[in-house]
Amino acid sequence: MLSSYSSFPERSKGRLFLEKEDPQRDCYQRDRDRLIHSSAFRRLMYKTQVFSHCGDDHYRTRLTHSLEVAQIARSIARLLGLNEDLTETIALAHDIGHPPFAHIGEEALQEVAAEHYRFEHNAQVLRILGEFEHQYMDFDGLNLTWETIEGLAKHNGPIQEPHQIIEEYNGLLDLELNKQPSLEAQIVSLADDIAYSSHDIDDGLLSGVITYQDLRHLPIIGENILKFEKTFPEASKSQVMYKARRRMIRFLIYDVVDVARENIKRYLLKTVDDIRELGFPAANFSEKVGKEMKEIKAFLYNNLYFYYSIRKSRVKLKRIVKELFEVFFHDPQCLPKDYYERFRIADSMNKKAQLVCDFIANLTDSSAIREHRQFFSTCVLERDY
């Protein structure tokens, strides 16, 4: 049963293009189904989380990360009586705007296109799902509901300086950018933090970049490791680690739920409008846990994301993205025909740079590497002619 402050499908603010209702599925269920069957969602399978999937099939990708975020977010939504379908849709789609190599690729596009365009993956997701999916005859894109679009644009909170893509959607739909997002969107942001803080640790261990001993000194997960080592002295390190991560995720989920319930009770939040009008997020980590999460994130940044071998990869991968941009921007006839035609008639350097970013953002890790080889490999292959 949905709580009064959840997002009710029958009260949705609708879609940009009017459609008939489905007699069997509500509007948020249709959003989720459209997303899952989209090519943009499938491409997440071949985009980096921390370690490139090209190097090892066992590392998480943007797809597996998004599935884990969705599972955690649905668990929180269920405990709070929120709309699980809307929550799941926002969670599954939240990383679709990432270019190849994820944050590394985003940094590269931001640097190389800076003179003409500001690339931002949180905004790019709206462009990809709103323009670059072509399954429907009556409109471009997936024609998602207002609540899904609002959640994707604002799941990290109100926006003071919106990206031009978000400004365009705001002009069409009035996304109330100065207000808090729905509680469904808020918990996706927290579920994202929970997922990568716990699962990036797992990939770090798998890679050997971080060690079991490193984790024993961290808050939350380290406390659980020490506890389970004493409770299960015969267990292997991998068994202790798996149980400690499970307990960490559960602990963080309950912390978010407790804070949200306390805020709902204290501030008499009865409707989704009350959630949006509140001057701060109704869902969050408690103060103590928030500090501990920052400590875990700092550990991951210092010991995993910027580890020397990963830093070496960052240099190479950023170079791939930057050089692809330079080729396509200065020689647009190298773009696929449909992109080239749009580039040719674009009336500003901003729009031209945006189109090149669009093309690159739709590439997977492996397709970006293949494109780069076609231009920069020293090997001349017969099939290139």
UniProtKB/Swiss-Prot annotation:
InterPro entries: dGTPase, dGTPase-like, dNTPase_2, HD/PDEase_dom, HD_domain, HDIG_dom, PHydrolase_assoc_dom. Residues 62-197 form the HD domain. One of its GO terms (molecular function) is dGTPase activity. CDD domains: HDc. Keywords: Hydrolase. GO terms for biological process: dGTP catabolic process. This is Deoxyguanosinetriphosphate triphosphohydrolase-like protein. It comes from Neorickettsia sennetsu (strain ATCC VR-367 / Miyayama).
